UniProtKB/Swiss-Prot annotation:
Chief location: cytoplasm
GO CC terms: cytosol
Protein name in UniProt: Nodulation protein A
Entry keyword annotation includes S-adenosyl-L-methionine: no
Alphabetical UniProt keywords: Acyltransferase, Cytoplasm, Nodulation, Transferase
Entries under NCBIfam families matching the protein: nodulat_NodA, PRK00756.1
Cited InterPro entries: NodA (IPR003484), Nodulation_prot_NodA_CS (IPR020567)
EC supergroup of this enzyme: transferase
EC number: 2.3.1.-
Transmembrane stretches, start-end: none
GO molecular function list: acyltransferase activity
Function summary: N-acyltransferase required for nodulation. Acts in the production of a small, heat-stable compound (Nod) that stimulates mitosis in various plant protoplasts.
Gene name in the database record: nodA
Protein location: Cytoplasm
Length: 196
């Protein structure tokens, strides 16, 4: 199904309650097929799962929200080095538009990374998405790193779970203000907060 989409950039404080309700519904429908647990954070009007983004790239078409990518500037610890990054995450595309692709949202978001003058864009994805993320390089400078464990805090403190989790994921780095050679060599990254 081909759909004409219109991308908008929205700062978090610009979103109204109706926007959050529409985005929450979008995420439930997008993440629900991957498991009910994945859709659970988006109950009601909550349009974020872990850390709340500060900026969102949202694609709309005649059926509403078509795709989404969030951005949050934060300091992460790469090995022993504190590093400012713009974390990209909370990505979704409506199931009927799977061909829209994450690369479209990256083409919208990369100029924003340049305007924000962050050293790097940063993201983490499951190993199952390796071939998918390796295609990023066609449109934006992206480096996919493996063999790195990432620690995140849980979004909520719970009595039945430890406060942090460590995942073996693929780390995606987008050089912006610095070269990739400036990215610290390490096998462990600490988000010092929940994932986006």
């Amino acid at each position: 199904m081909c759909s004409r989409v219109r991308w908008t950039l929205r700062w978090e404080s610009e979103l109204q309650l109706d926007d959050h309700v529409e985005l929450a519904s979008f995420f439930r429908k997008t993440y629900g097929p991957t498991g009910a647990f994945n859709a659970k954070p988006f109950e009601g009007s909550r349009s974020w799962a872990g850390a709340r983004p500060e900026l969102r790239a949202i694609a709309y078409d005649s059926n509403g929200v078509a795709a989404h990518m969030g951005l949050l500037r934060r300091f992460i610890k790469v090995g022993e080095v504190d590093l400012l990054v713009a974390e990209l995450g909370l990505y979704g595309v409506r199931p009927d538009l799977e061909g829209l692709g994450i690369s479209h949202s990256l083409r919208v978001m990369y100029p924003v990374l340049q305007q924000l003058r962050v050293p790097f864009g940063f993201g983490a994805v499951r190993h199952a998405l390796q071939k998918h993320v390796e295609r990023f390089g066609r449109h934006v400078p992206a480096n996919v790193l493996s063999g790195i464990r990432v620690r995140s805090t849980l979004p909520d403190a719970r009595l039945d779970l430890p406060p942090t989790r460590i995942e073996d994921v693929l780390v995606v780095v987008f050089p912006v203000e610095l070269a990739m050679s400036d990215w610290p060599t390490a096998t462990f990254i600490d988000r010092n907060g929940p994932e986006l």
